[in-house]
């Protein structure tokens, strides 16, 4: 209702083709549990005769012959193993480790490969470049009434919810991190939304430690949907056990900064709407004194973090 009072429609299905508006998050769940692609698709297929699954296997490189991928090398239970491909190799290690595996295999920017003593199998400078991600800023408010997860996940309430989940597979333990989603256009001339909101009836005292505030709280987190800033992900040694170096380079482009600032202002307006007057006690982070664009940008740089939607690296 608060978003609608600010001029944004309600939207019960943001995957219908019309994305703009606010509504409940759509989730992938079964019987109250978050359902992964492994659960939904891989496990049911494990009995097929043409599928073999190796677990506890760490890929260390792609085998090549004459510029063609012919297999994969991996470590498993302290031993080095290889598998060969009759037709082809599909690399699907995500935006972080796919470029790492390619570079360890000699596929990538020759300057980077030679720096770590890796023979160049195929020069491909784009590997590891073009990294982009959604950058989110958590804005929080204190709530007047005890209706949030901050107090519902403590003491007797938590025990009651645990029992409710155990017997009915319902309740707060089935909730996603944010229960409401919003998609808005920060400028009227653009065709589709450029900011998404994750809205939670909870607030963190310490995000990294996942500690909730002791008082009732609410969080509205905007992120820019189509960032222009680009980072990189590259190996930092020839050792497959070493994690790659990730350079986010978030908010490097002016359009990213302007869009996120406007997204934060919209969140402030929604929290100040009449529909939330009886619920919102005060603005916490950024506080009510932080209003200018420069102040909001400083807050975004200090408190923002990735939503872990990395793409673009190979």
Residue positions per predicted region:
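General small-molecule cofactor/ligand-binding pocket signal
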Residues: 11, 52-54, 119-123, 198
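FAD-dependent oxidoreductase catalytic-site/capping-region signature
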Residues: 1-16, 23-25, 144-147, 162-314
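Conserved redox-cofactor binding core of oxidoreductases
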Residues: 1-69, 75, 138-162, 299
